[in-house]
Amino acid sequence: MLFFRAFCSFGNGIKIHYSLQAMFTPEDLDLFAEKGIDVHTVEEQLASFKSGFPFLRILSSASVGNGILSLDEQQTQYYLDLWEGYLKDNHKVVKFVPASGAASRMFKDLYAFLSADYSEPQTDFEKKFFNSIEHFAFYSDLDEACLKNEGRSITDLIESGNYKAVVSNLLEAKGLNYGSLPKGLLKFHRYATNNRTAMEEHLTEGALYAASSDGEVNIHFTVSHEHLADFKALVAKKKADYERRYGVRYHISFSEQKPSTDTIAVDANNEPFRENGRPLFRPGGHGALIENLNDIDAEIIFVKNIDNVVPDRLKEPTVRFKKIIGGVLVSLQTEINRYITMLK
C-alpha cells in the first residue's frame, strides 16, 4: 500500500491539499519498471486526475511585433537567400513528422452510419460522401476491395442500395482497414497518374525545402510499434520513385513514442483502471514526443504533423514560408553564436 500526500499551488492563486492512497501489486510495479515509469510519476498522474488540470493564464493575444513577425519583400528575400545559402553549406536539417495518430476519428460519421438503423444516406455528410466518393484518392483501392469481397463494384453496390457494404469495405479489416490504420498510411491526395499517402506528401515536401546542396534529405517519423513495419514497407516501395523524381537521396528514420511517457488510465472515480487485472496505460499526447525530438542530431529541425499536408497545386506557399522560417532560424542561430563567442 502506497500513500502519497502533496500540496499544489497554481498560478491563479488556487491552492489544493489532497491525499492520495493507491494500491499497487508487485506485478504492477514490474509493469511500471518495464515501461520505465517511476511509481512516483504514476502517483503524480493520479493526483492530477483527482485535483484537476488548471487552465493556463493567457497574457495577451499574438500580434505584429508581439509574437508575429511581419516581413516586407526585401526582408522576405533576405531570409529566403539566407536559407538557400545555409543548405548549400550542407548543414544537417531534419524534417520531424509525428505520425502515430490513428485515423479513426476521421471516420466517426461513417462509423455512425454503419451502426445507424437506416440503410441509405440521411445526413448531409453521408449524402456528400457517397455523391463524391469517386473523387477520393482511395476510390480505386476501395473498388477492388468491393469486387473481391462483395462480388460487385462500388457503383453497383450504391445503385442497389447497399451503401453499408461500401463503408464496411473502407473501414474494416476485410477491406482497406482504414478505420484502424494511422493517417500516414492512408491515400490522401489524388493525382492524374498516381495517388499519394500522407507520408509520401512529406517525402515531397522534404525534397522541396530541406534538401542539402548535394541532395540529401533527412526525414524522421514517429510511429506506433503496431504500424512500424507497415511504414517501413511503404518507404521501401516508394522511396526510389521520389528520389528519381526530385533528384535527391532520402535518409528516413523512425522512432516509437517512449512507453515511459504513457499516462495511467483511470475510472469514473479517478482510480487506476485495470484491464485483465493490470493497470491500463494510454500513450501521452504529442507533447510526449519531446524526448524523441531531443534524440535527433541536427542543427535545424522542422516539425510538422503527418496530416498537415496539401496536394502539389497548393504546395508553393508551404514551401516558400518554410524556407522563410528556416532563414529566420539561421539568423537567430547566427546571433546566438555571436553572443556565445562574446561571452567566452
What are these regions (language model features)?
Residues G11-G13:
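Residue-identity detector for glycine
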Residues L20-A47:
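Intrinsically disordered, low-structural-confidence terminal and linker regions
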